[in-house]
């Protein structure tokens, strides 16, 4: 698996997320969002820590309204853990490193 966070758009969502073999953490963010700047290092950490069993992508909300609407993102930063068409879990707002790792471990250790 590749390490690191992949930047995607509405047009790439199906191929990068819905057709991925492993679960995908989708990080919804905005360039104007201060709290998103706090979350970015944690998203990178998750991508590197779980690279063997998780794909991590980020999607900027303003230029990608279709996916934002489909996944009912009401605020940023927001996370959706997706496997195929199924949302395994979601959260909105800044979360701590421990909460992020627990959020991921809950699902990835059961797969």
Curated annotation (Swiss-Prot):
Keywords: Disulfide bond, Electron transport, Redox-active center, Transport. The lineage of its organism: Bacteria, Bacillati, Cyanobacteriota, Cyanophyceae, Nostocales. Belongs to the thioredoxin family. GO terms for biological process: cell redox homeostasis. Pfam families: Thioredoxin (PF00085). InterPro entries: Thioredoxin, Thioredoxin-like_sf, Thioredoxin_CS, Thioredoxin_domain. One of its GO terms (cellular component) is cytosol. SUPFAM superfamilies: Thioredoxin-like. This is Thioredoxin 2. Residues 2-109 form the Thioredoxin domain. GO terms for molecular function: protein-disulfide reductase activity. Disulfide bonds join 33-36. Participates in various redox reactions through the reversible oxidation of its active center dithiol to a disulfide and catalyzes dithiol-disulfide exchange reactions.
């Amino acid at each position: 698996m590749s390490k690191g966070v992949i930047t995607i758009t509405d047009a790439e969502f199906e191929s990068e997320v819905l057709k991925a073999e492993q679960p995908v953490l989708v990080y919804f963010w905005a360039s104007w969002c201060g709290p998103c700047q706090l979350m970015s290092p944690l998203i990178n950490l998750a991508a590197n820590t779980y690279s063997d069993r998780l794909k991590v992508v980020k999607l900027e909300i303003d230029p990608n309204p279709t996916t934002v609407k489909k996944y009912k993102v009401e605020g940023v930063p927001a996370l959706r853990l997706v496997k195929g068409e199924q949302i395994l879990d979601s959260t909105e707002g800044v979360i701590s490193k421990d909460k992020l790792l627990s959020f991921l471990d809950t699902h990835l250790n059961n797969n």
